[in-house]
Amino acid sequence: MKPRFESSLANRAAQVVITLAGLALFLAIRPDIYASVSNRLMSDYQRKVVTPKLISDYMQRSREPKLQVGAGLNNADGWLNSDIEPSATQAYIDITERLPFHDMTLHAILGEQVIEHVTYEEGFRFFREAWRVLAPGGKLRVITPNLLSFVALFSDQKPPAYMARKLDFHYWPADTPDPACFIINGEMRSWGHQFVYTPKMLRASLEKAGFADVRQYAPGVTDDPDFKAVEVRAKTEWKDLNDFDSMAFEATR
């Protein structure tokens, strides 16, 4: 006769095996739930394990730490690249949350085609956070759609080449009687856009966040070599679209 504790241990082991087998069968029947659970576990691991290590390692080895938010596929050398859907080499950073850095520790922050994906209030909080974590003299560069460019599509000065290229690029109906209507609706509603700025509104938000020196540039144009090296859309097939419909602002702490 087996001792009671051995029998109890065997029973628990059997229960665990049965439970795991049942879970495996359920997940096999419902792959959608399996995918959801798997993605959640990977996301938690990325946020709680991978990201803190990436940030710690980068901050230790970098003399002038630079952060890129919403990096996507643009893994820039010498920068801490981050995204809300990061890869193994990117940190998980959500710009609507508190930035995971001490006060006055970063040299530069870049957000290319990012700020329009959050609300105005969330964008302002990000600007405040950027001001907090930038060292004195540190810069934030923001590239984002310019609402005035889309308003201009309804004027007599609208550029036909841009409109044709935009409609073709985004597969909107080229035979529409009012292409500008499709374009401006796309900019305001598609790709997760939440708030599209005018130059006046973006400048005011940056200054309200605490930045004293705020300057506007054309996309791809900057006096800072760090930003010049990493900004990507001004060097791609989207350059002609980017040049017309986007604006860049640099704000110094």
Language model: regions and residue ranges:
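Short, conserved clusters of charged catalytic residues that mark active-site
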Residues: 49-53, 93, 125, 197
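SAM-dependent nucleic-acid methyltransferase catalytic core
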Residues: 36-74, 222-232, 237-244
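S-adenosyl-L-methionine-dependent methyltransferase catalytic module, highlighting the catalytic core
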Residues: 122-131, 135, 139-252
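Conserved SAM-binding loop
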Residues: 64-152, 249-253
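Membrane-proximal basic amphipathic "stem/tether" segments
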Residues: 1-62
